[in-house]
């Protein structure tokens, strides 16, 4: 019913430039970013779908990406994670650095992400709500113990990955601490995300098509709370002309321009003072 109601929403989304976005952010005191897979595309992470090189073109999502597949073949999801960690040089990109800069300047207060790659934390953002979990954590299916992982531990040659699925000292098996198809997002995390959005005076929706219900519902929540919404995406999305006030046609990495404008303005103000 909620998505049906959203489909009937109408709003005139205006196209703006990065310079105009900088002016909008400069007037704000509590900015929240909602990010999706588009923010990781420039970090050499393959997309899940939509290309011949996508993850689900190589691995059957019914086996490798669902909770039912995990219970039947628990080693399969670990194979995907191991292969991606070993075969791709994954690093933070300029967009991640830009968000970290916006936080250090006092504008950005939190990041709500659908990504599981941990790149926002790696770039220096201190308050990150990872709705779909974090691939750098493993949770035991028996005792619920959570183990922190790193890039080395996820490599093919690591002790942790030498036998799949990895086993907990209690005898149980580890599952990546991420949301698989068939699982639901934690209600506590959704509540935390809504609380952050309720406090914001600007929501940046970056690199997400907003077709996943989690993102759509959070944007709808912001819309109902009359929050200003700006999309940063290379194309229009599901919420364009429905919920967003502005749309910036840009790659995630191009946010560097916004960060530099605001950083320059901040330094200029310090000199005047």
Swiss-Prot record:
The organism's place on the tree of life at top rank: Eukaryota
Ligand binding (NAD(+)): 36-56, 114-117, 132, 207-209, 233-235, 252
Binding, Zn(2+): 140, 143, 168, 170
GO aspect biological process, one term: telomere capping
Activity regulation statement: Inhibited by nicotinamide. Inhibited by surfactin, which is a competitive inhibitor of NAD and an uncompetitive inhibitor of acetylated peptide.
Entry GO MF terms: DNA binding; histone deacetylase activity, NAD-dependent; metal ion binding; NAD+ binding; protein-malonyllysine demalonylase activity; protein-succinyllysine desuccinylase activity
Active-site residue numbers: 132
Reported phenotype of the disruption mutant: Loss of binding to telomers and subtelomeric repeat regions (TAREs) and promoters of var genes.
Pfam family, one: SIR2
Database matches in Gene3D superfamilies: SIR2/SIRT2 'Small Domain, TPP-binding domain
Cofactor binding description: Binds 1 zinc ion per subunit.
PROSITE patterns, A to Z: SIRTUIN
Location within or outside the cell: Nucleus; Nucleus, Nucleolus; Chromosome, Telomere
Cellular component aspect of the GO annotation: chromatin silencing complex; chromosome, telomeric region; cytoplasm; cytosol; mitochondrion; nucleolus; nucleus
InterPro entries: DHS-like_NAD/FAD-binding_dom, NAD-dep_sirtuin_deacylases, Sirtuin, Sirtuin_cat_small_dom_sf, Sirtuin_class_III, Ssirtuin_cat_dom
Named cofactor requirement(s): Zn(2+)
Nucleus listed as a keyword: yes
Boundaries of every Deacetylase sirtuin-type domain copy: 11-265
Protein family (similarity comment): Belongs to the sirtuin family. Class III subfamily.
Function: NAD-dependent protein deacylase. Catalyzes the NAD-dependent hydrolysis of medium and long chain fatty acyl groups from lysine residues. Has weak NAD-dependent protein deacetylase activity. Regulates the endonuclease activity of ALBA3 by deacetylation of 'Lys-23'. Regulates the expression of the surface antigen-coding var genes central to the malaria pathogenesis.
Name of this chain's protein: NAD-dependent protein deacylase Sir2A
Annotated source species: Plasmodium falciparum (isolate 3D7)
Gene: Sir2A
């Amino acid at each position: 019913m909620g998505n049906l109601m959203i489909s009937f929403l109408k709003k005139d989304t205006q196209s703006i430039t990065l310079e105009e976005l900088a002016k909008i952010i400069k007037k704000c005191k509590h900015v929240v970013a909602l990010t999706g897979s588009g923010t990781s595309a420039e970090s050499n992470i393959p997309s899940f779908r939509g290309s011949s090189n996508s993850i689900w073109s190589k691995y059957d999502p019914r086996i490798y990406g669902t909770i039912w597949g995990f219970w039947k073949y628990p080693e399969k999801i670990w194979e995907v994670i191991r292969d991606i960690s070993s075969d791709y040089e994954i690093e933070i990109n300029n967009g991640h650095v830009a968000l970290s800069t916006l936080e250090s300047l006092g504008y950005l207060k939190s990041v709500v992400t659908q990504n599981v790659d941990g790149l926002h934390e790696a770039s220096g953002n201190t308050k990150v709500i990872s709705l779909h979990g974090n691939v750098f954590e493993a949770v035991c299916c028996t005792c619920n113990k959570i183990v922190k992982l790193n890039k080395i531990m996820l490599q093919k040659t690591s002790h942790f990955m030498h036998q799949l699925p990895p086993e907990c000292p209690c005898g149980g098996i580890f599952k990546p601490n991420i949301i698989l198809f068939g699982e639901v997002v934690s209600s506590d995390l959704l509540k935390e995300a809504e609380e952050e959005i309720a406090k914001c005076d600007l929501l940046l929706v970056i690199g997400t098509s907003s077709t996943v219900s989690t993102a759509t519902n959070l944007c709808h929540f912001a819309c109902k709370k009359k929050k200003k919404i700006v999309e940063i995406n290379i194309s229009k999305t599901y919420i364009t002309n429905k919920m967003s006030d502005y749309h910036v046609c840009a790659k995630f990495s191009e946010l560097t321009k916004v960060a530099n404008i605001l950083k320059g303005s901040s330094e200029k103000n310090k000199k005047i003072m």
